[in-house]
Amino acid sequence: MSGHTPYVIDSQQAHRLLQQIDVPQILRKLFRDLAAGQAVQPAQQLVEFPQGAGDFINYLGVLADDQVYGVKTSPYIVREQGPLVTAWTLLMSMQTGQPLLLCDAGELTTARTAATTAVAVDALTPLDAKRLAIVGSGPVAQAHLHYARGLRDWQDISLYSPNVNADKRARLNDIEPRLRIVEHLEHALEDADVILLCTSSATPVIDPSQLRKPALITSISTNAVRAHEVPPQALNDMQVYCDYRKTTPGSAGEMLIAASQHGWDAGQIHGDLAELLSEQTPRPTYARHVFFRSIGLGLEDIALANALYHLHHKAS
């Protein structure tokens, strides 16, 4: 193989290789590197297609310790039968300027999204938390369950989704046999200490003001413009954390709306993962709800692509 030709890893191969690496630990190192100035995370780049045909988002990142940089590009293509979303990551060498890896990033995106949430839950949740709730049932929700199920001594793990078919139910119970799949959202949220929102919804799926006690609520991104899983005005009543304070407020839908319409300011963010993992910011008090928002960082994609590259390189 020419030194100028990158390895190409398809979705099935990526899935297999991901089982061989400790994704949360790779991400913890990444955020500590970011805090120490050994990594660079530019803002996401959103480019809209003409005539409302969709868009694509570029996620960039530089890992100086590993001497690599790269980009994940993910299109959102509008179609009559529903939108099409794909993602590919290109890993480049900072030493030779040559491409190292081209990887179908679908599996990587799912893994890093869920593992980032798990890292946040571990950093933000009280050690005595007992009840975990998950909203959603697709591959991202399944990955969240996989990475979060062992973080605390959960006495109850419940999941709500309006779309749990027999196949999803079997997959979820294979991941965690103790899982309770409930028919009503309020049954999952009741007395929950941690609530993981794992949907592709562009509009709120829960109202934190309706919860009976303070909880950690985590939320992820989808490609829809200004997508948000909680009401934007709720940010004013929560302790807000995010994956990276320099980029998240400029992309997260509820933060953009809260800033423009509800008097919220990004300066109210209590901390990000780089600060939490380097102990530059304290853990929350839980006098009120805690909200963790991730948009997904290019650095996460690059770090996992780099780990897969080294696994593949070693095997070959």
Could you say what each language-model-derived stretch is?
Residues H228-S316:
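Adenosine-phosphate binding glycine-rich loop
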